[in-house]
Regions:
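N-terminal "pre-motor" subdomain/linker immediately upstream of P-loop NTPase catalytic cores
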Residues: 1-146
């Protein structure tokens, strides 16, 4: 199978509901959409396919596979600039071995901040940081919820 990393990443970037991409041997590409994993309609990935995709990831990131070759997991960031038919994007990548084969999880990092209303944050919490509605909130700022 001749699978291109750029095509997979483009599909994830263009769908604003996709947060993660899973590349695991024995399954098709899987994407987490609104918290639910869904398989992409494409052939199942074989270990060779995963190896080729991981190679493309490392080439794109201009990163050596030292940690991976030493038997360790590897975590790093990946930025891809805008190209013809590709909007560009930023990603967090984790490459690891699973059941004797390579696997990867890629988190899509959005350029824009999500809409607080879409996140389901209660209005009372938003009011702590927002002065746009004339609340004269002089102490507005960052609120951490742990």
């Amino acid at each position: 199978m001749d699978m291109k990393l750029q095509e997979i990443l483009e599909q994830a970037v263009r769908d604003e509901d996709v947060s993660d991409i899973f590349l695991v041997a024995g399954l098709p590409v899987t994407m987490k959409r609104n918290g639910v994993q869904a398989r992409v309609e494409m052939p199942f990935l074989m270990p060779k396919d995963i190896g080729e995709l991981v190679e493309q990831i490392y080439e794109e990131a201009k990163r050596k596979k030292t940690r991976l070759e030493n038997g360790e997991d590897d975590d790093f960031s990946l930025s891809m600039s805008r190209r013809e038919n590709f909007p560009g994007g930023r990603f967090r990548v984790n490459v690891f071995r699973q059941r004797g084969s390579l696997a990867a999880v890629i988190r899509v990092i959005r350029f824009e901040l999500p809409d607080p209303g879409k996140l389901g944050i209660p209005e009372d919490i938003l009011a702590l940081t927002d002065d746009s509605q004339g609340r004269n909130n002089k102490n507005g700022g960052l609120v951490l919820v742990t």
